[in-house]
């Protein structure tokens, strides 16, 4: 079991979640169902939580793959 992870590994995981989140937004636009809306919202909540925790730990979210406007796709419908 890995007790610690390096920053690159954490960045890779976060970037993957961001990618899946943006895909969920596209799915919601193509097929606006309550499931797809809920899925996109869930990704936003996860990413927002991680972003906030990074800031609390005095880490720059950009160093972990967050673009400056990472929230914009969630709110530009």
Where are these regions (language model features)?
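Short, charge-rich amphipathic interface segments used for partner binding and complex assembly
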Residues: 34-66
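Extended, charge-rich alpha-helical interface modules
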Residues: 13-23, 57-77
């Amino acid at each position: 079991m890995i007790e610690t992870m390096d920053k690159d590994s954490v960045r890779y995981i976060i970037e993957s979640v961001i990618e899946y989140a943006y895909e969920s937004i596209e799915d919601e636009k193509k097929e606006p169902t309550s499931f797809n809306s809920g899925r996109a919202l869930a990704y936003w909540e996860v990413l927002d939580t991680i972003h906030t925790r990074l800031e609390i730990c005095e880490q720059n979210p950009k160093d972990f793959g967050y673009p400056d406007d990472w929230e914009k796709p969630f709110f530009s419908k």
